[in-house]
């Protein structure tokens, strides 16, 4: 099982942060568009090749994101109205997310098979997450899903 770590900077206007492996090497670079509508986050690999694009839809009642992996739109994430805990609806072929989304502690399944999980690290400077990927062929998908939920 591969472990990756996401650490968001506390005060970053551009929304740029990295995803590192267990040896603290940059595996992915996430860059947000600054002052652009719609807001777009691009996920690139260590060779600067784009692996996914997250777009925040405009003119929606609640936040809505679409995730394109390898140029194909594969996930739509909609934040639902809720007073206390954030609630999301995820539309993706065969993808299911279970657990505590509010505490960012959840598991990801595809067609009933476990492919990864996410755990938020508390008491850190900025937001930090541990992402474990069970099926490495789905790594880009899992990282894209997590980034869409935390931005």
What are these regions (language model features)?
Residues 1-151:
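Intrinsically disordered, low-complexity proline/glycine-rich segments
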């Amino acid at each position: 099982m591969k472990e990756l770590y996401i650490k968001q900077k506390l005060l970053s206007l551009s929304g740029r942060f990295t995803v590192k492996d267990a040896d603290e090497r940059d595996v992915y670079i996430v860059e947000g568009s600054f002052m652009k509508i719609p807001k777009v986050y691009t996920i690139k690999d260590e060779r600067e090749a784009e692996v996914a694009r997250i777009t925040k839809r405009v003119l929606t009642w609640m936040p809505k994101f679409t995730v394109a992996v390898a140029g194909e739109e594969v996930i739509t994430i909609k934040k639902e109205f809720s007073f206390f805990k954030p609630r999301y609806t995820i539309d993706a072929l065969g993808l299911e997310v279970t657990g505590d989304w509010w505490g960012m502690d959840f598991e990801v399944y595809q067609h009933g098979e476990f492919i990864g999980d996410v755990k938020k690290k508390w008491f850190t400077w900025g937001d930090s997450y541990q992402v474990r990927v069970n099926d490495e062929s789905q790594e880009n998908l899992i990282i894209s899903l997590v980034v869409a939920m935390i931005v």
